[in-house]
Curated annotation (Swiss-Prot):
It comes from the Eukaryota. Disulfide bonds: none annotated. Residues 27-84 bind DNA. This is Dehydration-responsive element-binding protein 2F. The gene is DREB2F.
Amino acid sequence: MEKSSSMKQWKKGPARGKGGPQNALCQYRGVRQRTWGKWVAEIREPKKRARLWLGSFATAEEAAMAYDEAALKLYGHDAYLNLPHLQRNTRPSLSNSQRFKWVPSRKFISMFPSCGMLNVNAQPSVHIIQQRLEELKKTGLLSQSYSSSSSSTESKTNTSFLDEKTSKGETDNMFEGGDQKKPEIDLTEFLQQLGILKDENEAEPSEVAECHSPPPWNEQEETGSPFRTENFSWDTLIEMPRSETTTMQFDSSNFGSYDFEDDVSFPSIWDYYGSLD
């Protein structure tokens, strides 16, 4: 009795003891849980034993909705649905293949005027184009159009050539003007302007001043002192007359005799006061 009751409970559900932990509690048709927790959905084709794989999902509700969409496509509105209340509110969505298979018919194209529209069915052949060109040559329109186009192209090329010439001339003038404005400078002058080298004209007066400056006393003694032994002759001094020698001598009578042993004494301050009285 227990076996029969247990079988009735799992009549339409997934296989007992297989799949994930919540597989036994799932009541959705075509939905089961993997051992690692993912939910998968499958559906059986009508009048066939084969199953169609619908994919794996994070929740059981998503897998049930995928099963319902597949059932509506395969069995129509009479199909068994896991979530019928959701399918009634929403229309059956069209697949991507059905959305982009629409092609306009000839009747739809004929509704639009031909002027200003691209004729899809027009496929001109090379023979028709050659005939049209020959007709234009005979009438002379083609030669006129060719001459006008050639003249326009020549004028464009001439104007472009002149523009290039003028631009080149302007650039050359700019370079020439730049050369005239900036003359060449000697290297020595450039270094003198920077202050690295000194001017020769400035150096000459300093050299002249150095030449005219009196030499130091050591050089005077060595070169041209009046009492140098080489320039002074003792013979001329001996030959000089006595009168000249006496004039050269100092008059000792004018100076008082001074003895180093004498005591130098100054007048007292009382003598100064007595002279004032």
